[in-house]
Amino acid sequence: MRKPELLVPASSLEVLKVAVIFGADAVYIGGEVFGLRAKAKNFSMEDMKEGVEFAHAHGVKVYVTANILAHNQDLEGVRAYFAELKEIGPDALIISDPGVYRIAMEVCPEIERHISTQANNTNYGTYQFWYEQGAKRVVTARELSLAEIKEIREHIPEEMEIETFIHGAMCISYSGRCLLSNYFTGRDANQGACTHPCRWKYAVVEESRPGEYLPVYENERGTYIFNSKDLCMIEHIPDLLDAGIDSYKIEGRMKTALYVATVARTYRKAIDDYLESPKKYEENMEWYRDQISNCTYRQFTTGFFYGKPDHESQIYDSNTYVKEYTYLGIVGEKDEQGRYTIEQRNKFSVGEEIEVMKPDGDNITVTVKGIWDDEGNAMESAPHPKQKLWIDLGVELDKFDILRRKEME
């Protein structure tokens, strides 16, 4: 049985390093252009170079998204961008547009080419076509069942790889080809600027009563008719393996380091446990469920994997996340006094109980003993986001440990 790759997103250099440390086999990132995530922090060329070097030093691959649906005016920019990427040396480019693919073949043929889910890859004929064009991997359309993916595996060359999203947010539109954002706001989802109108509240209009807007109530908060639950396949690793999927992809190029660390660590352990012993995987199932629920999410569904989703896969009464923990920061360097630096993300205080999340699966509850600013002044709390601080938690920490606080129920 071929060990599947765990492919994790990263919105920034910091998050890439966390993904690597917390168990990713590969990380996918976007540059400042052509990557379909205009709102993400994204990577400068300098950060991308450092990220690729860091990942490769830890035996982890890096894939760069270039899955924009390009217009004529984009093509020369794509060519220049790929020439720069050639010097950096990522392991693959993720592409959906045939014109962009053609440029990649011309400019950097030595870099693997993976076909994005945006290309609507729903059948083995599509896979065979892209294989003939030299693609190493194709990402399945979100609308495929495990049975369909298994059939694709049976009809394509063994060396061709199948990548599938197994966790994260679900777009209500067909493989993400949505026009709602463009229609409502002029921001094109296929150019990376989606405003997520699927999460908004809607009313209906009866055609003979123009101007009369009728709310469709589920309860006092209204209804969110396009609002999908999040995909989660942590309980179905055996079925993913049986389908012949080579790469298990986590959605989330706009997520925090806490989210990425939590999901990467949980799936890393689940995959490794099952390959070691299916019994061990079953015995640890409650731990996986508990851990995967510790990051922000919108309730869970298995999507299309076991057939077309029904009403149970939608959230009708809210567009809000479930939030179990608050992200406080990432542990950095240690000073001579045994304090550790962090760039804090949310407020915490001296005397407060927080958790240290470690890559090996341990969560350590600690009390904040002291907080100092970068000039050495003692502080009672950390109220300013992104402020550099020094902290004493009374325990030994490691670089890239994650600090979080459990929210009150």
Where are these predicted regions, by residue range?
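Short beta-strand elements of ligand-binding domains
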Residues: 64-65, 95, 115-117
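Surface-exposed amphipathic alpha-helical tracts and adjacent flexible/coil segments at the periphery
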Residues: 1-10, 15-21, 26-33, 51-52, ...
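Gly/Gly-Pro- and Ser/Thr-rich, intrinsically disordered tail segments characteristic of DNA damage-repair
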Residues: 76, 113-122
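Glycine-rich, positively charged N-terminal anion/phosphate-binding segment
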Residues: 37-56
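Alpha-helix capping/helix-boundary segments
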Residues: 99-100
